Amino acid sequence: MHGLLLAAGLLSLPLRVLAHPQPSTSLTSQGVDLNAYRMADRSSYMSSDEMKLEQPSISSLSGGNYVETATEVVKRMMPGVTFRMVDDHYVGESGISHVYFRQTMHGMDIDNSDFNVNIGKDGKVLSFGNSFYTNPTPDKAPVEKRDFSDPMKALHGARKALNLPINADKATIKSMNEHEVMFMGTSGALSDPQGKLCYMAKEDGTLALTWRVETDMGDNWLLSYVDAKDTDKVHNVVDYVSHATYQVYPWPVPDPTEGKRAVLQNPWNLKASPFTWISDGKNNYSTTRGNNAIAQANFDGGSDYLNNYRPNNKNLKFEYPYAPNMSPPKSYIDASVTQLFYSANMVHDLYYMLGFTEKAGNFQVNNRNQGGKGGDFVILNAQDGSGTNNANFATPPDGQPGRMRVYIWTKAKPARDSSFEAGTVIHEYTHGLSNRLCGGPANSACLNGMESGGMGEGWGDFFATAIRLKPNDNRNANYVHGEWVNNSPRGNRMFPYSTSLQTNPLVYTSCNKYNEVHAIGTVWCSILYEVLWNLIDKHGKNDGPTPVFENGVPKDGKYLAMKLVLDGMAIQPCKPTFVQARNAILDADMNLTKGANKCELWKAFAKRGLGTGAKYDPKNRTGSKAVPKECQ
């Protein structure tokens, strides 16, 4: 065998599984704190304003196609560094071109070293993000020196360190290519584990050769970076799980306490779902399956979703009884699956209109030759038996299905099914949105740092909250996340989302005392809630289920805020900080409206301590209430 025993290319890029409205930082059921293995947030981001001052030669670059321009940026900024372009570049709905690069060393990836370039509608460089490694590098390739362990030892190392219930006693190694392997004959994981030899830039500024061991455990889908020499040492871990007629609680009804069920006819948006929700363009279905999603019961928590039960009606009447006092949950499983299918498809259609399209890496089986990789609807598991009091979403790279698991919550009697809390479904689906947009559709490992992971939680809460706004709401409206499933008026966040600093005192520097992504996410959503109301106060609020555009810009403040936040996800660097994400939102507004909302945005950020003087340090963030002179 030449070189190494190794496994499956870009396909093995990790998937992000995000669990949550209920805070959980442990490897499910194994008692391992994954926070201890999070990657450091080490990206830099140069905004359009900063680039004009500090890199005018880059700012003025243009000519050729956007890929050539982006490649030239990387060459000029990182001379002598080897890299490859990731095959997921695209032109977004706002006219910004996004190109992604991965640093290489001796023909292998440095797996957490990325560079993203954003090209504006005028063909000039808008901004870029960078986490390339610049310290001393090894002289010789490890393949030449054979300076690494057998990959099987790495699998055992990951299993031991993370207490994974994987049996590999009879496992064999199948070589996929020079640097990647698949572990055959294991049990305990939902699919065959994979291994990839790659470098990892460590927090101390050195480079480690690692085996990246990928294991899908269901509620956790892990990429474990095991030291290639000392396989008892795990450097970092990425977790991908972060987590007709339809009788449903229609949007924006958030839960059974705030509205009544209704029978909706053909609720899809044909621009976003031209095959409707129950066809993929090749096959028509009479069940909860289509181009965007497939929904079913999953009582045993297993992975055989295709053969699981789902409601079926040849007349396409998905109308089933449900009331909050019904018990046990299985007695209303048809209504649960239908509600989950409805909510997830509504999210798909809305996000599509805001820019999460095929080429941006959305979740669809059939991409209609519109770009991106198809074959990846969202698997929706209702009443999932693998846990309680939670929900999660697994986000693999584009072309592999996302997976949402929603559980029964036992904090009330009778127990409550989180399919019926729209905020839970929106929050989880938004993990898929943010992980596909940040760093590009082929890289699902960009939100695994503490601050970036916190923003992943905050974005989920932000979109869930914005969608549930009521017609009579004004900036004095307060919203609690997860109150129904938790059976608590406090929900599952520290404070309500509010524009009042008395009701919600969280500011940027509050993050200094938190070491948990949901707490940090609450701070981020609190900041975005200020953005939301500043833009609504300026542009009004569209209470309809879809935005109305004028020249590509939402006409109202609610959907404009959602659009700018979504565009910012695609612009920001891999593993962003609050400061970098703030700058990306400002750049998104500069691109979309020529900066018409600059002062509204700055005032919102500054109110919560993310003004012009804010600085990131993981242990000692500096807050600022300053705004640019023109906004004073």
UniProtKB/Swiss-Prot annotation:
Pfam families: FTP, Peptidase_M36
Residues that carry a glycan: N284, N591, N620
Manner of cofactor binding, per the entry note: Binds 1 zinc ion per subunit.
Subcellular location: Secreted
Chief localization: secreted
A GO molecular-function annotation: zinc ion binding
Propiece residues: 20-243
Entry keyword Repeat: no
Any GO BP annotation: proteolysis
Family: Belongs to the peptidase M36 family.
PANTHER family noted in UniProt: EXTRACELLULAR METALLOPROTEINASE MEP (PTHR33478:SF1)
Name of the protein: Extracellular metalloproteinase 1
